[in-house]
Amino acid sequence: MRFSAVAGRYARALLNVAIEKEKEEEYLRFLDLVCQIYESSRELFDNPILKPEKKISLIKEIMKSFGQEMDEFQERFLTLVFERKRQKLLRNIRDLFEYEKILSEQKVPANLSIAHSPEDEELSLLRKFVRKYALKDPVFDISIDESLIAGALVEFEGFRLDTTVQGRLKRIAREALKRGEMS
């Protein structure tokens, strides 16, 4: 996924407010909900005829129906986003907010692709591996990919650990091709 520098500025600014108010998780849930609302009615929220105030009012109403309230900083944040026509960056802002939040907690974001739902023991071993190299606790973004057959693929801070059967088969194929070229 490509991240926008503009989205990064919005994400960091909102995270700074969230940290100051000690509401990082609440603000992340707010961004999740706003993204869901926006993505479910993108045509409506991208309509240039509809004023930003009306768009925010609609979001507030929908949030209220989910039992959620918007504080003044969240409302000001959305006002900036919609007035500057940056609503298409909301998902990017949300993802960067989460990434920056992990970093602010002195943890390391790590992608974990695995062929099945990971067991606690597997996660523990993978955490130890990441901790050994990153010197920080990982926060895994787990994706299940049955094409890996078995094993896990962990990526963090430029490191890549591939213990998957699929990865091993690819290495064997590359080595066989190299040997074939050499003979």
Curated annotation (Swiss-Prot):
GO terms for cellular component: plasma membrane; proton-transporting ATP synthase complex. GO terms for biological process: proton motive force-driven ATP synthesis. Gene3D superfamilies: N-terminal domain of the delta subunit of the F1F0-ATP synthase (1.10.520.20). It is found in: Cell inner membrane. It is a peripheral membrane protein. Keywords: ATP synthesis, Cell inner membrane, Cell membrane, CF(1), Hydrogen ion transport, Ion transport, Membrane, Transport. The keyword ATP-binding does not apply. InterPro entries: ATP_synth_OSCP/delta_N_sf, ATPase_OSCP/dsu. It comes from the Bacteria. GO terms for molecular function: proton-transporting ATP synthase activity, rotational mechanism. NCBIfam families: ATP_synt_delta (TIGR01145), PRK13441.1 (NF009976). F-type ATPases have 2 components, F(1) - the catalytic core - and F(0) - the membrane proton channel. F(1) has five subunits: alpha(3), beta(3), gamma(1), delta(1), epsilon(1). F(0) has three main subunits: a(1), b(2) and c(10-14). The alpha and beta chains form an alternating ring which encloses part of the gamma chain. F(1) is attached to F(0) by a central stalk formed by the gamma and epsilon chains, while a peripheral stalk is formed by the delta and b chains. F(1)F(0) ATP synthase produces ATP from ADP in the presence of a proton or sodium gradient. F-type ATPases consist of two structural domains, F(1) containing the extramembraneous catalytic core and F(0) containing the membrane proton channel, linked together by a central stalk and a peripheral stalk. During catalysis, ATP synthesis in the catalytic domain of F(1) is coupled via a rotary mechanism of the central stalk subunits to proton translocation. This protein is part of the stalk that links CF(0) to CF(1). It either transmits conformational changes from CF(0) to CF(1) or is implicated in proton conduction. Belongs to the ATPase delta chain family. This is ATP synthase subunit delta. The gene is atpH.
